[in-house]
Amino acid sequence: QNYVVVPVSADRGLCGGFNSSINKETFRLVKSLEDDGKNVQLMPVGKKSRDFFNRVMKDKILDSFADLNVSVNGYDAALQVSNKLQELYFDGKFDKCIIVFNKFKSAISQEVTQQQLIPLDVSDSSKEENVDDSAVKAIYDYEPDEETILKDLLPKNVSIQIFKVLLESDAGEHGARMAAMDNATRNAGEMIDSLTLKYNRTRQAFITKELIEIISGA
């Protein structure tokens, strides 16, 4: 099977381990898939992942995206990635696509997450155990037909899933950067206090030494 892995990172740094965690998880996933005999290619989203994998796995990069700026460009940013993925999929370039991103948990917490994007992963866990499928299907009437509707909806679903991922990653990036800058400011404050104390002690010792020399000379 041919896989495409899409790591989603930020375009900028100064956000703690936000980018490195994505790159490490993607690297681990690629090696794991290759150990299982899979053929793996990459399509990094974000400069930090693109630059990292250009150094360590350049031969595996199928395409890449940077400066999507989802907070400004919105859904159009997701469409750029989605359209390229679907084009490659329908051309038979890959069988499965997995996206790796930082899932937003809170302003100070993000969780590295893997999600199968293509083909659509329909989990049975979302179904009610006591629901009769035949009874549910009997309620709905499809026009024109289920297959035609799915052909239209599935590409849109991929685009929406990517849009969701980009938004979560963007929110997580801002949270991670805020936390990183807060820690840096706190550490800088502690360093200033430490250096100020060291300076005052050195100055005091120097003055004491001069006084002793003056007294000794007198």
Model-derived features with residue positions:
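C-terminal beta-strand-loop-alpha-helix "lid" module of Rossmann-like NAD(P)-dependent dehydrogenases
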Residues: Q1-A218
